[in-house]
Amino acid sequence: MDIQSHFDKYSVANGLLIYAQMPNATQLREYSEWKSIPNFQLNGKQEGIKLLRVGEPYTKNDGSKITPFVVYKMFDISQTNLPPKEKYSKKIDDKILLKAFIHDNPVDIKVEDVLTSGKCVEWNSEENLLYIQRGAEPSQLYQVISREVVKAEIESDNLVIDDFKSKCASYMICKKQGIDVSNYDFNDIPESFKNLSSKEIRKELGEIKELVEEFNNRVNHFMESISKHSKNKDYER
């Protein structure tokens, strides 16, 4: 999940390949891209990370059409003489980020002073409402809001699996946004997940990735609109 949240533009299959070959990778490029950087060198003889991409479709002699997968290599910055890219993320105001987390989501939200359950966020399926406690800690809200919103989007009758998949998605969402995820615990993997084939694992991860992408797209759309509005105000001045 760490790999998929960091390399979120990569497919699930390629995320698994990165994890299998270099789980500590941070910045991947093809050799030709690295070579365009002045003074670049590989650190000795390095094996590239083998990934897959869709090749050019072609027609076989029998008339059937084939779309092949082509193997290509990527190199991590740690395999080069270049310094690691400094991770810099501008601190986003909690109020703005919380608004982004609830922006245009598929559930209705209601803010209450106190929730009778004692939780900071509670999903009521009968009312189709997500209740949020006013004044709750932002770090808690990010995690629970993302988890409950994702859970509401999962179409399944298995509550145990729904809980686990929504927790995985919430972890990846918060990790991507730089929110502390140290309190997540994944020791409760459902028994049905433990015996999945590699194909079935990819399928489950693919569904989680789609949920994460949908949530992150809404967050990004809100943040872009805020940034655009801010630039317009600066221009008017």
Predicted segments with their positions:
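N-terminal accessory/interface modules of nucleic-acid-binding and processing proteins
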Residues: 1-237
